[in-house]
Amino acid sequence: MLELDLQLATEAPAPSEAQFREWCALALRQRTADSELTIRLVDEPEGRELNHTWRQKDYATNVLSFPADVPDELLDIPLLGDLVICVEVVEREAKEQGKELEAHWAHLVIHGCLHLLGYDHIDDDEAEEMETLEQTLLAELGHPDPYADDDAQKHSTVTIKDSE
């Protein structure tokens, strides 16, 4: 079971909750345990503020992932963490990169969920493993390879790990 808390902190149009559930469930299907996660959809000012606070970057990025650092045994449902998605950045990127908006949304949600599961793209081997899984999952949805034309977008999602 997936418990999804979808928070809308922007009035910009976004995919339906059913779409978010489908994309998350696909990315998390390798996980046998129940899972809880939050997706917060934000505008550019909030996206910029969070990116500045956590990464010292003064711009809004498309997706930030915040993996939970709470032992599963302390929770009724294992908390995976939070994704923060800047709607305006997602829309702009899709347009600039000539990508179908729904496909770009699906990619970024899947990419963020994989970060919450511990996948990363710090080195080439990790990146290849993560990207291959993303490509496979997106193909199941009928979406094209998101990395086919634009290597610069390969590693757009940032994982924030609490250093405390």
UniProtKB/Swiss-Prot annotation:
It comes from the Bacteria. GO terms for molecular function: metalloendopeptidase activity; RNA endonuclease activity; zinc ion binding. It holds the Pfam family YbeY. Its EC number is 3.1.-.-. Residues 155-164 have a biased composition (Polar residues). It is found in: Cytoplasm. Its cofactor is Zn(2+). GO terms for biological process: rRNA processing. Keywords: Cytoplasm, Endonuclease, Hydrolase, Metal-binding, Nuclease, Ribosome biogenesis, rRNA processing, Zinc. Zn(2+) binds at H111, H115, H121. Disulfide bonds: none annotated. Its main location: cytoplasm. Binds 1 zinc ion. GO terms for cellular component: cytoplasm. Residues 140-164 are annotated as: Disordered. The keyword Zinc applies. Belongs to the endoribonuclease YbeY family. PANTHER family: ENDORIBONUCLEASE YBEY, CHLOROPLASTIC. Single strand-specific metallo-endoribonuclease involved in late-stage 70S ribosome quality control and in maturation of the 3' terminus of the 16S rRNA. NCBIfam families: rRNA maturation RNase YbeY. This is Endoribonuclease YbeY. The gene is ybeY.
